[in-house]
Amino acid sequence: MASSQVGDMVNGNAEPTRHLAKFPPSLWGDRFTSFTLDKQLWDKYGNEIEVLKEQVRSMVVAGGRKAAEQINLINVLERLGVSYHFEKEIEEQLEQLFAKFEDNEDYDLFTIALHFRIFRQHGYKMSCDVFNKFRDSNGEFKETVSNDVQGMLSLYEATYLKIRGEGFLDEAHAFTIAQLESLVGGPHLSSDLSEQVMHALKQSIHRGFPRLEAKHFISFYEKDASRNETLLRLAKLDFNQLQLSHREELCHIFRWWKELDLISKVPYARDRAVECFFWSTCAYYEPQHSVGRAVLTKIMLLLSVTDDTYDAYGTYDELKLYTNAVQRWDVSAMDELPDYMKALYRALLNVYDEVERDLAKQGRDYGVHHSKEAFKEIVRSYEIEAEWFKEGYVASFEEYMKNALVTSTGRLHTTSCFMGLEADVATTEAFEWILTKPKMVAASGAIGRLVDDVMSHDEEQERGHVATGLDCYMKQRGVSKQEAIVELYKMIENAWRDINEEMLKPTAISMKLLIRVLNLSRISDVVYKYVDGYTHPEIIKDHVISLFEDPIPM
């Protein structure tokens, strides 16, 4: 998110020239304005879920199962989206499995890669040396690997857990993509397996929205001849019940946003209440985090309008006034602002007051101060970009990234996300950890910033925009746009490696917190994969409908 708008008053009191972005309008009209939760259906789902949960819990802790079977059960639970019900039991099982793991010669590629991915996802640093037996004396993959589609698919997914210095996993990633792409639609794959491969190549497990990926996997799993009907039934019920909760929450948010009526006062801004809630649901979908989803959505909406104000409407002089007002964080500062900014500033103060009151009821309002300070920091960095645009200044890539890691919103989103977690998880120490500018938060911000720079570059430059990371890199290195894009994607991949490494034990803070930073990073991979899906919401419209409207047939 970067500033592109400056303007000068012409002929005294005339309206300044503004480089309006003409963002696409909201897609949703009044679609989410009303929703009545079917309490009878909710209770019906809930009663059966409780019975099935106990049956599945018994499966997880039951002895006598081989390690490969146990790791596969854990994988299925995670991919079906129901593992959050059994976190304690799963962690206990994984601790035992990792301690006893041996690179058994009988394990095939599918099983080894599955162990690797599951262990790494849970912070256990399994060495990629476990894959050596699938390579020949020249270091190339054995011919048998190319004939093992399930094994290659499992290895492909495992490569997304790589850290720096693991060149083999880079090679394996390129190899499996090439092999799997060559097989899609061919005679050697069943239609069901081909569908799985195509989806995996489009969206990896590790970088996908957990709830969306669960829904996809449920559709694959119910076609699996070896499926467990109890697991499948639990997954369907759980998805549909949680969807009802999310839909009700979205209705409350949507009505709140309509009643706030901010967009009518700042019509230049993107109207994205539904998309912000979608974003928040990726950060945490679990039922106990309803307050967190509401808090994060509201703050994201305010930041979105603030970004558009700096990016596509405000003059430089107006933006300086607004920056100063945000630093003061006092209602009296409103008097100095233009009318349209008064509406935004009033909303900012009121929403944070509302959030603070709601969290104070639960004794966890101490994070609000940190969120406010992060918001102030972003606004200061927005003004820096506004000044760069005004002066026609192209920063060095290093100077750009120093400021961009602030405007990428990593600190604000992480802080605001933590505010919605339980007090015994998001402690005061957790918020202080964010202030240390940890590598994981920086990496998450870098991913979001660089992906957005690439995907929105042409459109932003067409209307007039501060030099992005792509422009700064091209000028400093004297390379073409395409060459710069290649280098920026290398940086994005390294940032993902850093995230993966920061989640390996021992971790700096609780894994329950780190998973939220990971989830915030996943948003960039889904929403900005091919184009800026936040600015152009039709790109992610099907995702929104799938998550919040379309239940799974029972």
From Swiss-Prot:
Matching Gene3D superfamilies: Farnesyl Diphosphate Synthase (1.10.600.10), Terpene synthase, N-terminal domain (1.50.10.130)
Gene giving rise to this polypeptide: TPS1A
Any GO BP: diterpenoid biosynthetic process
SUPFAM superfamilies: Terpenoid cyclases/Protein prenyltransferases, Terpenoid synthases
Organism, scientific name: Camellia hiemalis (Camellia)
Keyword terms: Lyase, Magnesium, Metal-binding
EC number: 4.2.3.204
Top-level EC class as recorded in UniProt: lyase
Tissue/organ expression: Expressed in flowers.
Protein's name in the database: Valerianol synthase TPS1A
UniProt cross-references to CDD domains, sorted A to Z: Terpene_cyclase_plant_C1
Note describing how the cofactor binds: Binds 3 Mg(2+) ions per subunit.
Molecular function as annotated in GO: carbon-oxygen lyase activity, acting on phosphates; magnesium ion binding; terpene synthase activity
Pfam families noted in UniProt: Terpene_synth (PF01397), Terpene_synth_C (PF03936)
Catalyzed reaction equations: (2E,6E)-farnesyl diphosphate + H2O = valerianol + diphosphate
Binding residues for Mg(2+) 2: 307, 311
Functional note: Terpene synthase that catalyzes the biosynthesis of the terpene valerianol, which is a volatile compound of floral scent.
PANTHER family hit by this protein: ALPHA-HUMULENE_(-)-(E)-BETA-CARYOPHYLLENE SYNTHASE, OS04G0344100 PROTEIN-RELATED
InterPro entries from the UniProt entry: Isoprenoid_synthase_dom_sf (IPR008949), Terpene_cyclase-like_1_C (IPR034741), Terpene_cyclase_plant_C1 (IPR044814), Terpene_synth_N (IPR001906), Terpene_synth_N_sf (IPR036965), Terpene_synthase-like (IPR050148), Terpene_synthase_metal-bd (IPR005630), Terpenoid_cyclase/PrenylTrfase (IPR008930)
